[in-house]
């Protein structure tokens, strides 16, 4: 669930902000809010999505025919009507707050009302294997650039520019960090524990990665060795290449972990090697689903085009998923507004899992 945090300053998260990874054995809950203005086409659109670890579990879209917080995972559907009513009202309040925030931001940055602008925010908490808070965070952005962020001490702010410094001063005067910290250490952790228990079969599972190495000639003198890990969960994984036992980190091309479209993830790491020296290179894979790290080599006799076909198909699905996720995430971070003074603020409510409203009121 998300709780509404007290009113003061907080806004804007970078459009490129991605889900951050947690430590092994830890779990996270995050909400991503986005408000986008669209002059001449009605009120700004507001979307929020909630994630537990790498699984989306709720979503709200102000453009829906009947805007409500909606379930996105089977295990959250067991929550009763009061939960959905409360989360819906929290999201609607945040949507209204962010609409005001967008207007205030125009004044902060001396911008015209003719253009489209975006406010984004990510906030949430991580807990360790013992269920205790490891880290809390709240980061905001405006038009894809950092705006203001809660520091790791959960008691101070880092402002990215002079406009954000206005917000920082107002939040400090209102002791906004204290209220947000209370949410992160209390409500956020409590709801995360509840979700982990209710969704334990999904959220606390460990799907073992399917691994193999492929060989791709570049010229008569060089070839690319690519180490694949497919179908794993959770998303945290380590792929490294070694040459004669020495890490090749600087020479490794490593892609970001990607959703496969079926609730699992994919990743690969590649190195360019001299032809004829392939046997000197080993790929090392570490993942929660493995009893011990794997060591792989390219086996010339075992290479097949079948895995590649499967990967291409998976990446095709991935493309659709990523596009949808980007649209959602870039249209899904949560801010709240209120008032005309020109100061961002958050509003906290005691029993909503969402965490905090952000608004620019004086």
From Swiss-Prot:
Residues 25-114 are annotated as: Alpha-1. GO terms for biological process: antigen processing and presentation of endogenous peptide antigen via MHC class I via ER pathway, TAP-independent; antigen processing and presentation of endogenous peptide antigen via MHC class Ib; immune response; positive regulation of T cell mediated cytotoxicity. Residues 25-308 are extracellular. It comes from the Eukaryota. Residues 209-295 form the Ig-like C1-type domain. Residues 299-308 are annotated as: Connecting peptide. Disulfide bonds join 125-188, 227-283. It is a single-pass type I membrane protein. One of its GO terms (molecular function) is signaling receptor binding. Residues 115-206 are annotated as: Alpha-2. Its main location: membrane. Belongs to the MHC class I family. This is Class I histocompatibility antigen, Gogo-B*0101 alpha chain. It comes from Gorilla gorilla gorilla. The lineage of its organism: Eukaryota, Metazoa, Chordata, Craniata, Vertebrata.
């Amino acid at each position: 669930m998300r709780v509404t945090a007290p009113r003061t300053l907080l806004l804007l998260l970078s459009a490129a902000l991605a889900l951050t990874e947690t430590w092994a054995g830890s779990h996270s809950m995050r909400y991503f809010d986005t408000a986008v203005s669209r002059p001449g086409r009605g009120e700004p659109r507001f979307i929020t999505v909630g994630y537990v670890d790498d699984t989306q579990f709720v979503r709200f879209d102000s453009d829906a025919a009947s805007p409500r917080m909606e379930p996105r995972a089977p295990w959250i559907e067991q929550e009763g009507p009061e939960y959905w009513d409360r989360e819906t009202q929290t999201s609607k309040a945040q949507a209204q707050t962010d609409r005001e925030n967008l207007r205030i931001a125009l004044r902060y940055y001396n911008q015209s009302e003719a253009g489209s602008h975006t406010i984004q925010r990510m906030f949430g908490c991580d807990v360790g294997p013992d269920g205790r808070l490891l880290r809390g965070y709240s980061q905001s952005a405006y038009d894809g650039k950092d705006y203001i962020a809660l520091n790791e001490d959960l008691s101070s702010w880092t402002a990215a520019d002079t406009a954000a410094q206005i917000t920082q001063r107002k939040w400090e005067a209102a002791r906004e960090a204290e209220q947000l910290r209370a949410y992160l250490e209390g409500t956020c952790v409590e709801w995360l524990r509840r979700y982990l228990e209710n969704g334990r079969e999904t959220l606390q599972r460990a799907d073992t990665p399917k691994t193999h190495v492929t060989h791709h000639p570049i010229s008569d003198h060089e070839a690319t060795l690519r180490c694949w890990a497919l179908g794993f969960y959770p998303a945290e994984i380590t792929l490294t290449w070694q040459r004669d036992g020495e890490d090749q980190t600087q020479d490794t091309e490593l892609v970001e972990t990607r959703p496969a479209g079926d609730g699992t993830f994919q990743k690969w790491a590649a190195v360019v090697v001299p032809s004829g020296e392939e046997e000197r290179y080993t790929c090392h894979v570490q993942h929660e689903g493995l009893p011990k790290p794997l060591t792989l080599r390219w086996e010339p006799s075992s290479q097949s085009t079948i895995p590649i076909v499967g990967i291409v198909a998976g990446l095709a699905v991935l493309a659709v998923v990523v596009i949808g996720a980007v649209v959602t995430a870039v249209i899904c971070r949560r801010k709240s507004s209120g008032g005309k003074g020109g100061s961002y603020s958050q509003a906290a409510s005691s029993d909503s899992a969402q965490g905090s409203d952000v608004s620019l009121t004086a």
